[in-house]
Amino acid sequence: MQYGICNLSIVPLRKEATDTSELVSQVLYGDIFKILEQRKNWSKIRLAFDSYEGWIDNKQYLETTEEQYKYLHKETPKLCIDLVEFIQDTNQQLHPIVLGSTLNALSILNHSHDGNIVEGKAPKENIIQSAFLYLNAPYLWGGKTPFGIDCSGFTQMVYKLNGYKLLRDASQQATQGEALSFIEESEPGDLAFFDNNEGVITHVGIIMKDNYIIHAHGKVRIDRLDHSGIYNVDKKMHTHKLRVIKKVI
């Protein structure tokens, strides 16, 4: 088995081994992974954080050792808490990194960083505060950053910043935590899931107080939440049908 680490800010993770393939997720600076298959230009990887799989360009990561991988995997993540920061290499060149990037491998990559970091589990009350960091970020299928993010990437990154692990897709996240029977039982920071006409869970958002929800739909935005689903305050209509509320923390 071979191992890798992302040494660039935001790297696309694709469904197939081609630049034109669907963006299924993104690999952020400091993310580590197992290399499942290597081709001339592409590698199929499995991310350590959420076991998500996809194809990454061979020019956009560095191979690492099994020992380094295991060391980094068991370490408590040290995360960038600023929207944009910079790390510096041995040539004094700056490299941008974004909110939620992992900084545990700085010494392995011969990089330095003197910005703000966060590590460990935070109180549940911090979830909404972290969610506001992504407010108005444009929607991007497969995205995980303030410059483009999808609904489950948003919830995953917000929870990650507070020391909690969610899976990558909304349907996967819906398998986590404890189901609540009523909205009234929920607390700010709980997750609400929404399904389509076929009953497939396709959307997720973070519940706020007073029956509001923050979620990625066009952009990261705040709408009303009721027993039917999400009521879009701009369109004056329901846009998502509520399926289940889950308490993960």
Where are these regions (language model features)?
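Boundary regions of SH3-family modules and the immediately adjacent low-complexity/disordered segments
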Residues: M1-Q2, S25, I32, L47-A137
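Active-site nucleophilic cysteine motif
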Residues: A131, T145-N162
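...with weaker cross-activation on analogous glycine-rich loops/strands in unrelated enzymes
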Residues: Y164-I222, S228
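A generic structural signal for residues embedded in beta-strands
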Residues: C6, I35, A105, F193-F194, ...
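Short aromatic-glycine-enriched beta-strand elements
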Residues: K40-K44
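Aromatic- and glycine-rich peptidoglycan recognition patches
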Residues: Y3, I10, L62-T64, L180, ...
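Short alpha-helix capping/helix-loop boundary micro-motifs
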Residues: A17-E22, V84-Q93, A174-F182
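Short, basic/aromatic beta-hairpin or loop at an interaction surface
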Residues: Y3-R14, Y71-E85, M157-Q173, M208
